[in-house]
Each structure stands twice: as structure tokens, then as C-alpha cells.
Regions:
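Residue-level recognition of beta-strand termini and adjacent short loop/turns
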Residues: 191, 197-223
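C-terminal motif of bacterial Sec signal peptides marking the signal peptidase cleavage site
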Residues: 16-19
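Conserved small/polar residues in nucleotide/adenosyl-binding loops
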Residues: 228-229
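Sec-dependent signal peptide recognition
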Residues: 4-11
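Tryptophan-anchored aromatic micro-motifs
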Residues: 174-191
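Beta-sandwich strand segments
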Residues: 151-164
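Acidic/polar, low-complexity intrinsically disordered N-terminal segments immediately downstream
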Residues: 21-112, 117, 121-123, 135-141, ...
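A short beta-strand micro-motif common to beta-rich folds, especially ectodomain repeats
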Residues: 126-128, 139-150
Length: 229
């Protein structure tokens, strides 16, 4: 009796799995277009500092869905002038000195804002060239991008919040930048013999062969941090 019940259960499961497979193969799922970047936050993009040369970056765009993209899509990308302001206020409120700043247009170039994704493909790359010469790298610079929507377009951007935009925090590096262990560095505050110990310090790029870091035990969120570089 038990063997019959087990056999019947296995047959039922096979029928259910077969039905599910047929259901998904015929599923009419909307193919939403989005950036492949972390959502609800800025995406830190680390790029090699190149003196007198652009620093290239390729941002992926993807077509979401449980079935393969079956049509040619031309995705229209633009500069998002609103989301960064909202993000800054939601995360830092009145601390405007901590705000990310929008990267001026003379420090980047985008060869083509229209990205083609052919049928049978679910991803394409958007080329961006950054130029750091003359940029104040003590600030946090962000390039905010958005996927445009219009009834005339043959695609729909992802409806979930933050999926159709990307906040690219541009962080250049050179051969000397990065995190350094500083446990041997003792900082003595005024009127005390007890040292303040900082475990690590991050060194930031100035140019191809130069770095800077904040002196002593200065925290990067202090309002006067620029005066102690």
C-alpha cells in the first residue's frame, strides 16, 4: 500500500513539474530595462587616474525577465538631475558639506546616449570616458544617470524604485592610493598624554603620482576636514 502511495505521489509531482515548465516557457513577461548597479545607494566606481588621458568605464544595461529578449531595443539614457538631490537630503539632511556633488559635464563624455540591445541579447554596455584633470578630488563626485521613458519607445524601464537610475560615485586610484595600516601612528590631543590610535587611513588621489590623506585622527565627516589635508 505504501509503495502505491509513493508511486502515486511521484507521478503527481512529475505532472506538476511538467505543467510549471510549460507555464514558464509560454509566460508573457514584461522585459524591463535597468542599469546593472546597486540600488538605493551610490555605486562606487574605481578608475585608474590617467594624466592627459580619459579613464574609460563601461556601464551595463540589462533586460530583466524570465524569458529571453526577443526584439531589438534602443535604450535612451539621460542625466538625472533630481535623484542625487533627494538621496543627499535623505541620507545627510542639513549636513550639506557631506553631500555628493554632481560631476560637471566637462569632466566626462558619453559617445552615445542611445544604447542598442539586439534581439536574443539581454545586456549591453554604455561607454563613459572620465577626465580627472583639474577636478577637486577632495569632494565626492557622482554622475547620475537615468533610463528615459516615453510611449514612443519600444521598451519600459524597470518600475521598481532606483532600478532605472544609477548614481556613479567616481573614485580614481593610482599606484599609491588605498588603505594603509596606521596602528603605529599615535595622535596626542591637547592637554593629555593619552594617544588616539587610528587603525587605518585611506589615501586619496591628487594626480598620477600624488596622494593625500586627512591628518592625525581627523574623521572624514568633520566639517573642517579640508583644512587638515
Amino acid at each position: 500500500m505504501k509503495k502505491k502511495n509513493i508511486s502515486l505521489l511521484l507521478v503527481t509531482l512529475l505532472v506538476m513539474l511538467s505543467s510549471c515548465s510549460e507555464f514558464y516557457s509560454d509566460e508573457q513577461y514584461e522585459h524591463y530595462v535597468s542599469f546593472k548597479a546597486p540600488t538605493s545607494t551610490v555605486s562606487r566606481i574605481r578608475l585608474k587616474y590617467r594624466k592627459g588621458q580619459p579613464s574609460p568605464y563601461r556601464l551595463p544595461l540589462i533586460v530583466a525577465g524570465s524569458t529571453m529578449n526577443n526584439k531589438d531595443i534602443d535604450v535612451h539614457v539621460g542625466i538625472d538631475n533630481d535623484t542625487l538631490d533627494i538621496y543627499n537630503y535623505e541620507h545627510y539632511y542639513e549636513r550639506e558639506d557631506l553631500y555628493y556633488k554632481q560631476l560637471p559635464e566637462n569632466f566626462y563624455s558619453i559617445p552615445n546616449y542611445d544604447i542598442h540591445i539586439p534581439a536574443g541579447e539581454c545586456q549591453a554596455l554604455m561607454d563613459i570616458n572620465f577626465n580627472f584633470n583639474g577636478l577637486d578630488l577632495s569632494e565626492k563626485w557622482v554622475l547620475p544617470l537615468i533610463i528615459k521613458d516615453d510611449p514612443s519607445y519600444n521598451y519600459t524601464s524597470h518600475p521598481r524604485k532606483n532600478f532605472n537610475n544609477a548614481l556613479l560615485w567616481i573614485t580614481p586610484f593610482n599606484d599609491f592610493s588605498g588603505n594603509y595600516g596606521t596602528t603605529a601612528l599615535n595622535v596626542f590631543p591637547e592637554d593629555t598624554n593619552k594617544p588616539l590610535v587610528v587603525d587605518t587611513r585611506e589615501a586619496y588621489v591628487v594626480d598620477e603620482n600624488t596622494i593625500f590623506f586627512y591628518a592625525g585622527a581627523i574623521k572624514e565627516k568633520r566639517t573642517d576636514r579640508k583644512s587638515v589635508v
